[in-house]
Amino acid sequence: VKRLTKENSVVGIDLQDGWDRDHIDNTQDLLTCELNEEFDLIIHLAGKSGVRESINDPAGYWRNNVEVSKRLFARYPDTRVLYASSSSAYEPDLNPYAASKYVVEEAAERYCNTLGMRFHTVYSDNPRKGMFLQKLIDNELEYTTTHYRDFIHLFDLIDGILILIENPRITGTIDIGTGHPVKIANLAPELPVRINTPGEREWTCANIEKMKALGFKPKYTVEKFLTNQENDNIINLFNGETI
């Protein structure tokens, strides 16, 4: 948001504190709040994420991911909408989260000016609770898996989104990752490996050829992040502050 506000007028609607306007709380959400303003561009990153959590709350994931997105598409049919999809959408039958992302992509196809950004496994210095890497850093992880994941740092992800903003002719869906999957077990070889983890993809790897053609080049690696070679000195690209 800070990078966008340097040259644009930005309106944010979010559950988090910090917005100057259109902050919403737990008593209202994007299904009920007023959508009166018009925009040149909408970046829709809202929704519920998390594969395992979705198994316990499929209705909540459908409501927050599918119904909210459909409302935005219908309300702004002529506005360019970049929305957060997921690599999970490649196998929608595995879990409710993947299914919700796939259905959003299907709904978006009815509108000619939408782009689903298929984020792969995003990490940063301030992840949501329960994320694999945070548990690993906090020594709370009990086991690893045989999965391979394409980890992408939040700063690289933001660079990708900004590139897509500048390329309005790109529609449909597009992968945003590094193109280099990492074996989960290799990140913590001292921990036991669990083989059977239902509802999860065995392998994810972003095809970033389209993004590379637009000038996208990931800068960060998860291995260096975990060894603190970069983690302690990552500079906030938005305002020059260490985060």
Placement of each model-derived feature along the sequence:
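C-terminal substrate-binding subdomain of Rossmann-fold SDR/epimerase-dehydratase oxidoreductases
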Residues: 1, 142-243
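N-terminal Rossmann/SDR dinucleotide-binding element
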Residues: 1-41
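SDR active-site strand-loop-helix element
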Residues: 13, 42-46, 81-87, 117-119
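NAD(P)H-binding glycine-rich loop region in Rossmannoid oxidoreductase-like domains
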Residues: 27, 31-64, 88-91
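NAD(P)-cofactor binding segment of oxidoreductase domains
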Residues: 42, 56-81, 106-107
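Short alpha-helix in the Rossmann-fold core of NAD(P)-dependent oxidoreductases
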Residues: 47, 62-69, 82, 100-101, ...
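Conserved Rossmann-fold NAD(P)-dependent oxidoreductase catalytic core, especially the SDR/UDP-sugar
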Residues: 70-98, 115
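NAD(P)-dependent short-chain dehydrogenase/reductase
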Residues: 96-98, 102, 106-158, 162
